[in-house]
Amino acid sequence: MPKLTIDHIPVEVPPGTSVLEAAKTAGIWIPHFCYHPALGSVGACRLCAVKLLDGPVKGIQMSCMLPAQDGMVVSTTDPEALKMRSLVIEWLMMNHPHDCPVCDEGGECLLQDYTVAGGHGIRRFEGKKRTHVNQDLGPHIQHEMNRCIQCYRCVRFYQEYAGGSDFGVMGSARRGYYRRFQEGTLESPFSGNLVDICPTGVFTDKTARFRARYWDYEMAPSVCPHCSLGCNTVPAARYRELLKTMARENPAVNGHFICDRGRFSNAAVNDPARPRVPLVDGEEVSWAAALDATMLRIEEFMELYGPGRLALIGSPRLPLEGGVLLARLAGLIGTEYLCYFAGRDEGERVAAAVSLLADGRTASMADVRKADCVVILESDLRDEGPMMLLAVRQAWRSGAPVFLVGKHAPLAQALAVSIEAIELSIIEEVPLAIFERAVVICGTRNNPPAATESLAHTDAKIAYLFPGPNAFGAGLLMKEHGAVALAEAVASGRVKGIIAVEADIPEALLAGVPFVVAADWLPTETVRRAQIVLPTAAWVETDGTYVTFEGRAQRFRKVMASGLPIRGLPARYHASPDKPAPLHPPRVHRSVSPGGELRPAWRFVAELIERCGGDAVTEPFVGRWERLRGLDPEGEGVMLWEF
């Protein structure tokens, strides 16, 4: 392993490591624009200049392009290197519009930071600036080409990493223009990553444009709830409104990126039609009154129908805390009808997959990226897990063949990321035995339990995509407490009432029961049909835990206070008819924010447990789940197989 010295600090790194990366391991930050850990080095920006004082190479060198070698003595603070970096910044700023006050990147802009750090403050260039006309790239990405510094990050990610073909660079040198051939929405399902990967303000989030500065945002480490992959994110909110979502690095999960669904699906949280106030028979009441009414109706229900006729239903999107407590509540009420999947077929498929993966055969997205063979079995990854498709592309770029097996594995998903895939009818046609790191990717939507069991006879690792962010956790709980056929129980009249906690129940089942209590944050059909509605907090309004498709428990943190967004508050919250408050807080003082009477789903279940005679619940994770209490939201998560 090469041993070198950087700023008087001895460093030892693996062969092939660049000087820039070696400096990072020693805690030394060398300014750079074009280098990115997921993309590698290209040497376009020339900002990472260092001076080599001794060793095989000497003089000013670009640290991102220079492999570390034995005997190197590197200085990042040599006056000659500092002068070089200062000149590079000045060159980059020659054509810059200097529009930081109106740029959404202000406060998180690398160009801004390095310009200040490099001491460039006086513009000496008196010539005419080069200018460009911006393109309309669709509803999500704002294009401001005049801020470009030609680092090539955007086109390298879009074309090489994500396999997009409708965006690239036109021209060369200072005339380079990063664009589509014609205006229009970017086609890649990962185009939103241009916002994160651009070191300046060329690509910004159009959905949050002019809404806040970086330092205005409330942010916390979180987990994407839009599929079972568990991509790590940083949601950003202001004034009780979720404005945007950014990717958070986790090498074991999503790497550096997220899909556009996870980035731009923020509207549901801000929806004014969300359940925000407890309702009893359509009338707004307090939480205490709603809980009193719930207990009274449950007692009346038991007297009328007897014990055991009430079903408790969770869902794949209910955080693990609520699912664990539902099992405890079922024991207190005395019902055997505890369900985590309203549809029987879905529950059976998830249970079969969880049983198959119980021996630790599950493949992470990191495993997929390093696989030497990938099989996509009866699954469309664009729908069931877009970031898994991006992981498959990285395996394909490294030489792994990709097989599409079955009628539910369309070729279009491979074409979306420019993969040359091989289509087959049955998995037995794939020569899995000749590969060392083969991975089979399948989903529970189109794979029956029998097909799942057939995978047990292969040596390949398996990546099973589930129907929700905590479907794996729900499957474990269902396996522990047993599965029931809810539809048959409702049809036969054995179930006459339902308490649904963040569950989407088919309309046919709802029509068969006279008593429904719904605790949810989405305006579902279950909520519309319920006699009692308890509004719960969305994932950005509370702490919680999701278990990903591979059995990895990950904690997400509360990002913002619950309540109606200040922008567009209903008229009843305005100070007066003459002083509407569409964009700033109303001048009315209240003890609770408008629409802010929301509680975590597990807290609602805990209240019922206590009112049914159970012990007070201060912590949902007890017994075998206790190890999850101290889960670090910024870590890689904990594999449930470990305990």
Give residue spans per PLM region.
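Non-catalytic alpha/beta scaffold blocks inside enzyme catalytic domains
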Residues: 342-630
